[in-house]
């Protein structure tokens, strides 16, 4: 299994003591604190409050929460029925409805248990072992698959740049957080960026091009890009510059015009790489709000309105196969979670003292009180605006001659 020694660890599961801890992402980047998850209720709260987030990560936390909850129940007498266990699992599934990974993992657990036990059977050691083995495999498979996604994305980037005859420095734009903090390790979209920088940074690249810079979007209103992606990029010393979500068009145009951004090289944006919370059968993709507009920006610069190979941008979705939902035909059928209004009208963070120390955390209002607010957590990018879907499979999914993805093949 691939190592996570060089990357952050958002999920800690102790196989010997059967304990689960998660890195509280609401406290990052100023405070690193691990939160104990002892029950399914703890997991529901952590997922709902977004103390853990990212489709693969919440699925893993959800599964491990069922493990620790079941283990504790057995130690306390073990009088819970399979039916009661399933009720708790169904409740946990409602914590984040848009991300398909959580639902898939919890439904897999129910199917495996139902294959051998009835609803009225007591949850015993055999039931526990089914849940335990599945959850450990889910974690280990996700980690291995993330490294495959990174390698496959790197290969696609190299092939694309060679095909375009591109030479020199290039940049990548991403949104939200899709790295070690959103998965078991390495990441999906950020995993591709990690793998690409490892092989294509200027000092290492054997090609005629190199990855010079990454531009993570702030990702309002929860600021996962500002808080989490910058935390990971800084941790691994990958050169980056944070931008607001509404700066991308200007950024791309400026770099494509061979102009510098601050002291950064005028390296054109060649790829926008995003993760996914759900990819449906036709390739429509639900991801963090703001993703759709990034695809329209890429589409504009790829149009005939602008010329020159430096202006061509590939829009890539990176996700494990577990994120692909073949039971849903189009993005119109995806349930989009809506978050509380106060997440948009307030900001939370610690006081930064003049001496550099960290003070108390406060919530500060930034909008007129009592106003109407619409705060969807996700949007849906139409498959027509997506160039490639990269999974752990060696085949990178691109559209056929009819402009359609064939994800079921």
UniProtKB/Swiss-Prot annotation:
GO terms for biological process: L-methionine salvage from methylthioadenosine. The keyword Amino-acid biosynthesis applies. It is found in: Cytoplasm; Nucleus. GO terms for molecular function: S-methyl-5-thioribose-1-phosphate isomerase activity. Keywords: Amino-acid biosynthesis, Cytoplasm, Isomerase, Methionine biosynthesis, Nucleus. Pathway: Amino-acid biosynthesis; L-methionine biosynthesis via salvage pathway; L-methionine from S-methyl-5-thio-alpha-D-ribose 1-phosphate: step 1/6. GO terms for cellular component: cytoplasm; nucleus. It is an enzyme of class 5 (isomerase). This is Methylthioribose-1-phosphate isomerase. It comes from Scheffersomyces stipitis (strain ATCC 58785 / CBS 6054 / NBRC 10063 / NRRL Y-11545).
């Amino acid at each position: 299994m691939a190592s996570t020694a060089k990357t952050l660890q958002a999920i800690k599961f102790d196989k010997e003591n059967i304990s689960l801890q998660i890195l509280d992402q609401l406290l990052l980047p100023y405070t690193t604190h691990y939160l104990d998850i002892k029950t399914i209720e703890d997991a529901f709260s952590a997922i709902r409050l977004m103390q853990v987030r990212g489709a693969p990560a919440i699925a893993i936390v959800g599964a491990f929460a069922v493990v620790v909850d079941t283990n504790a129940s057995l130690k306390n007498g073990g009088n819970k029925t399979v039916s009661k266990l399933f009720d708790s699992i169904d409740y946990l599934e409602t914590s984040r409805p848009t991300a398909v990974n959580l639902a898939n993992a919890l439904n897999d657990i129910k199917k495996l248990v139902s294959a051998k036990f009835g609803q009225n059977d007591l949850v015993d050691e055999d039931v526990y072992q089914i849940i335990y083995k599945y959850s450990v495999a889910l974690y280990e498979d996700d980690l291995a698959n993330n490294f495959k996604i990174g390698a496959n994305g790197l290969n696609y980037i190299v092939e694309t740049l060679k095909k375009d005859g591109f030479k020199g420095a290039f940049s990548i734009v991403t949104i939200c957080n899709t790295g070690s903090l959103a998965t078991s390790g390495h990441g999906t979209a950020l995993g591709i960026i990690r793998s690409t920088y490892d092989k294509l940074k200027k000092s290492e690249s054997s090609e005629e091009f190199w990855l010079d810079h990454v531009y993570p979007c702030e990702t309002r209103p929860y600021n996962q890009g500002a808080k989490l992606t910058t935390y990971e990029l800084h941790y691994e010393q990958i050169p980056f510059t944070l931008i607001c979500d509404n700066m991308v068009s200007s950024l791309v145009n400026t770099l494509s015009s061979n102009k510098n951004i601050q002291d950064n090289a005028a390296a054109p944006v060649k790829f926008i790489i995003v993760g996914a919370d759900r990819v449906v059968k036709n390739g429509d993709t639900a991801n963090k709000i703001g993703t759709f507009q990034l695809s329209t920006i890429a589409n504009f610069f790829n149009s005939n309105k602008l010329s020159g190979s430096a202006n061509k941008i590939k829009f890539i979705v990176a996700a494990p196969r577990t994120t692909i939902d073949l039971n849903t035909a189009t993005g119109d059928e995806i349930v989009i979670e809506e978050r509380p209004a106060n997440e948009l009208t307030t900001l939370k963070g610690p006081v930064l003292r003049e001496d550099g120390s960290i003070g108390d955390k406060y919530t500060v209002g930034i909008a007129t009180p009592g106003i109407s607010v619409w705060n969807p957590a996700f949007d849906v990018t139409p498959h027509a605006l997506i160039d490639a879907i990269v999974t752990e499979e060696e085949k990178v999914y691109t559209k056929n001659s009819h402009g359609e993805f064939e994800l079921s093949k």
